Amino acid sequence: MKQKHILKWLGIALGAYLLYAVLTAIFVPLPQKEAAGELWSQYEARLSTDASQERVRSIEDTDSALLWRLQLIESAEREVVFSTFDLRADGSGQDLMAALYGAAQRGVRFYDPIDLLRPWKLNYRLHDKYLIADGSKYILGGRNSNDLFLGSYQENQNIDRDVLVVSDGGEGSSVSQLLTYFESVWSQPENKTITGKTSSQTDALQERYAALCAVHGKELAAVDWEVETAAVTHVSLLSGSPRAEAKAPELWDALVRLMAQGDDILLQTPYIICNDKMYNDLEALAETRQLRVLTNAVENGANPSGCSDYLREKQNILSRGVDVYEVVCGQSLHTKTILIGNDLSVVGSFNADMRSAYLDTELMLVIESEEVNAALRQESVQYIDQSRLALHDGGTEYGAQFEEVTLPWT
């Protein structure tokens, strides 16, 4: 009887805690803050200063994405900074860890580890994805660190984009902005440094690193970074708050102001999950300029909640004057890019959703270059050709290579 009594009270306690966790996860972030325009003011101030000498290359395919990361790590002589949302112990994840182990061990820290007394903080994710070598070169974008995004370890892969930036490391450079941002995240009081004994897996990592060098020795040799990149007019980092808390949508506000600079906007995002404020912003943009969204069709997406929300909100989105390319290409689109006019390209981790705007840490890189903008617009053509274009006037057009896919439940 005593044992049953204890189990009963344990069940009640567990149920009460789960209810507490669910309710706080819903209601703590519910009051949504407003942007004050601070991030936009910082961005405008940077434009008034002399631009640093920085060069850029876009990284479009998974094999190149893994190889450039390995090359960047191999080139480091002093320091490597690595921040990622989703690192797995699969093929590409082990490749990265082997390369990092081969370069240096500089400490590992978890952003906002689990706090059982404040379970709502699980809502706030470190969604940044970047890798910096020696304070002079970095890769930043939307790719996570696993086989869905890197290498050729599995057949099914996501479509995504990174940019490689080579910098002079000057005071106003984007790499200095990124390092400052990293330090602000690294120093958050909630973070936890992981310590412990040397893992028994270090020998395996050393062997894997040796194998990587044997296979990719030529590619991992000294890289002519200038030849591999193109000069651009200006590069600047936009970042949200590093705190693990509900955030003012400063980054979204800055992106909207940026989009207002052009008359032809292509917004690439895996899904669209907005509140009225965000939809109103899109509507205001679409009133005086062409605004088109390139996103996954319901039958193409890998995010069930994103797809279901788009089904529910599709007519609302179209009524705002936005045209939507619904991609059906056999691979889930994970790209987060905004192409503005003929000279601005914005690439990073920010999805067009409330989580990116109000909860998670996010980074977007603003690149001023007609050459880069033209190249990224050309890259998008293959997905536009495989899309169904839902027009805001109620019409529908089909790309030259669009193929209808029947959903299994229809």
List the model feature ranges, each with a label:
Residues 2-128, 133-410:
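Charged, low-complexity intrinsically disordered terminal segments
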